[in-house]
C-alpha cells in the first residue's frame, strides 16, 4: 500500500465575508490564526453539520468584545469563513440561518480541491495564504 500524502489545511473567505472583514479591520493573519486554533481543537462553539462559531481576535486586541464568525469547517482539511458579525450587534444566529449554513457546509465541504480552485478562480472564494513559516 502506498502512503497517502498529508492533506494541506486550506483557509478561505467568501466575498461577503471579505467585505465584513475589511470594514471590521480584521486581517488575513487574524483569520488564519482563528482557523488554526479551530484546527488545533480550540473551537468556541460547534454548531453541528460542519458549522462552527469562532471569536476573532484582531491584532493586539482580545476576543471577548470583538467579532464573531461562522465557519464551514472540516478538521485538517478546510475552513471557509462565510459570515461575520459584531457581538454588540448580534448575539446569535437564528435557527433558520443555522440550517442554511449547514446546507451550505454540506455542499462546500464536499467540494474536491479542483472544485475549490474553480470557486477561487471565479471569485466566489478567496484563499487565505498561511503566514511564512507555517
Label each PLM-derived region with a short phrase:
Residues 4-5, 19, 36-40, 78, ...:
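Preference for short coil/turn "hinge" residues that link or interrupt alpha-helices
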Residues 44-85, 89:
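Basic/aromatic recognition patch in beta-strand/loop cores that engages polyanionic ligands
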Residues 72-126, 130:
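Enriched for short, Lys/Arg-rich terminal
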